[in-house]
Curated annotation (Swiss-Prot):
Stretch forming the signal peptide: none
Protein species of origin: Roseobacter denitrificans (strain ATCC 33942 / OCh 114)
Coiled coil: none
Record-level GO BP terms: translation
Transmembrane segments: none
Name of the featured protein: Large ribosomal subunit protein uL10
């Protein structure tokens, strides 16, 4: 890799570190090519990405970025899993680590907050952005349906009373 390619890689990594909601650092020593492709596919399906980069270049790219706290984790054979959704990359990494003993989560960063392996696991258990939006939308819709039910209740009560009176009159 010549100097221009290294500078380009540092720029790309810098953009990734700035735009990612979460970055997870893991060791991947011993994974086969097929296993790495599986990890990449899972990350892509979840809206994230996986990147293997030279630790030295990644540390340079981290300088001045919000997630610079992960620089200490970049030792040995490391892989970066990242996504704009703060939960997606953590879920992918955590699920893959449960299935494959060779994939070991070292930690990560969520914005300026450094995460250890337990922190990444905690983030992975959080609901995704879409799930949170659906929950909030459901909560916002509930009062409207309650109001509609309360408004409609007197009319249905009157209808049932009239029905009862009609049944008694017919009998």
């Amino acid at each position: 890799m010549d100097r221009a390619q290294k500078e380009q890689l540092v720029d790309e990594l810098g953009q990734i570190f700035e735009s990612s909601g979460v970055v997870v650092v893991s060791h991947y020593a011993g994974l086969t090519v097929a296993e790495m492709q599986d990890l990449r596919a899972r990350a892509r399906d979840a809206g994230g990405s996986v990147r293997v980069a030279k630790n030295r270049l990644a540390k340079i790219a981290l300088e001045g970025k919000p997630c610079a706290s992960i620089a200490d984790l970049l030792t040995g054979m490391t892989v970066l899993t990242f996504s704009e959704d703060p939960v997606a990359a953590a879920k992918v990494a955590q699920d893959y680590a449960k299935e494959n003993q060779k994939f070991v989560i070292l930690g990560g960063a969520m914005g300026e907050n450094a995460l250890d392996a337990a922190g990444v696991e905690a983030v992975s258990k959080m609901p995704s952005r879409e799930e949170l939006i659906a929950t909030i939308a459901g909560m916002l819709g509930a009062p409207a349906s309650n109001i509609a039910g309360a408004i409609g209740a007197p009319a249905s009560n009157i209808a049932s009373i009239l029905s009862t009176v009609e049944d008694k009159a017919a009998a």
